[in-house]
Amino acid sequence: MHNLVINDLPEEGLPTALFEPSELIDFKIAWDWQRKWQEKLLAEPSNKQAVWMLEHFDCYTLGRGASEDNLLFDVEKPPIDFYRIDRGGDVTHHLPGQLVVYLVLDLRRYKTDLDWYLRQLENVLLDVLDGLGLNGYRINGMTGVWCNGKKVASIGISCRRWITQHGIALNVDCDLLGFNQIVPCGLKDYQTGRLNSWLPKLQMKEVRFLMKKSLNKRFGLLWI
């Protein structure tokens, strides 16, 4: 059992706009938010960075260069909304009960290295699981985070002149049935998991708190 105390977040760091809509958000809307903020940062590098923490309506997204062989449904008649997008990675599923974190960051303020950025996002997820008393881990040569033999978090990003988009998706208390319609991330030999399989009383607000805390730690973000 986890025993998390939600207290105050750190009060130092780079001022960063944090958006946490309480309602479910259509994927296209969230994607548009990111693109507009990215344009602002490209136009004026001194602008604030931005992070969104939200949950989506059911949808599938297919990253650039991904294989349609990993879609186990008729592409012409998808069972739910389906989007081809500009992030890296293969196909994934977004749905209620999954915490999605989108980051529009200027990597010139950190390190202009996409592999470093991906590993930092994994570190954020590992921090969150550790804060819940779970043993998360990476698998060499793959991107994402696993727990007890199951992949619980996916990462997919895009970057334009070192300004990022997209981010991470962490399965908290979502229905996993929709993952049966795809080969998640193109990985045939791995099962998909969710955190409340091991922590039945886990609440999304706890995960959000730990996510904000770790993003402050790993990227020095001060929430405004």
Curated annotation (Swiss-Prot):
Lineage summary: Bacteria, Bacillati, Cyanobacteriota, Cyanophyceae, Synechococcales
Gene Ontology terms: biological process: protein modification process
Alphabetized UniProt keyword annotations: Acyltransferase, Cytoplasm, Transferase
Record-given protein name: Octanoyltransferase
Swiss-Prot/TrEMBL site (Lowers pKa of active site Cys) positions: K151
Organism for this UniProt entry: Prochlorococcus marinus (strain SARG / CCMP1375 / SS120)
InterPro entries (alphabetical): aa-tRNA-synth_II/BPL/LPL (IPR045864), BPL_LPL_catalytic (IPR004143), Octanoyltransferase (IPR000544), Octanoyltransferase_CS (IPR020605)
Domain of life: Bacteria
BPL/LPL catalytic domain location: 45-223
Job of this protein: Catalyzes the transfer of endogenously produced octanoic acid from octanoyl-acyl-carrier-protein onto the lipoyl domains of lipoate-dependent enzymes. Lipoyl-ACP can also act as a substrate although octanoyl-ACP is likely to be the physiological substrate.
Enzyme Commission designation: 2.3.1.181
SUPFAM superfamilies linked to this entry: Class II aaRS and biotin synthetases
Reactions listed under catalytic activity: octanoyl-[ACP] + L-lysyl-[protein] = N(6)-octanoyl-L-lysyl-[protein] + holo-[ACP] + H(+)
